[in-house]
Amino acid sequence: MIEHASKADRKNDRPVKRRPRRSAEETRRDILAKAEELFRERGFNAVAIADIAAALSMSPANIFKNFSSKNALVDALGFEQIGVFERQICPLDKSHPPLERLRHLAHNLMEQHHQDLNKNPYVFEMILMTAKQDMKCGDYYKTVIVKLLAEIIEDGVEAGTYAATDALSLGETVLHALTSVIHPVLIAREDIGNLATRCDQLVDLIDAGLRNPLAK
């Protein structure tokens, strides 16, 4: 009788279904998506690696296998956001005057950063908490913007609008000049209308300097 029951039990056994093994890239994307979700909900400083791991039903060790630290996680999120920015920025081409292109780019940067701060306050907190860290995403973002500015300057020189110069070096200088209207920390509590006016004034000043550089 016992033997018969055992056979019946074995007959009704079903193989345990295991979740399909995810690739390293899929796991990495899951971690980034969950981290951003938790940062958005609770704030950057309130979320630990252990919280992200628990939300994904995985061990903290698995998070660290993909990201060496919380800052490394932030760096990866930063690169993802820069990728979105590069797809959305749509700078004006050389058929437009250099001044118009500078103004368009500066306003786009200012408005995008201001909008991000209002829609995603965790971004501001994240920037403050990692300000003193060596973040590769920040360096890359700077490179992207400088390149866009340098292209405008080069086209302006080619058209005879701007004086000949080292466009890449000057692009970096122009970025520094625009910092007060595009850096998230500096514009977080500013009225967008006041920022727009200041941005226009700065762009006009930059344009004048590019047309009439100081004699060395």
What are these regions (language model features)?
Residues L56-F67:
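Short hydrophobic/aromatic patch on the recognition helix
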Residues R18-R22, E26, S68, A72, ...:
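Residues at secondary-structure transition points
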Residues R101, H113-M135, H183-L186:
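Amphipathic alpha-helical segments used for helix-helix packing
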Residues M1-R18, H104, E111, Q115, ...:
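C-terminal peripheral helix-coil segments that are non-catalytic and often amphipathic
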Residues M1-R42, V47-A55, A72-D75:
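Basic, helix-initiating cap at the start of DNA-binding domains
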Residues A163, A167-G171:
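Membrane-interface starts of transmembrane alpha-helices
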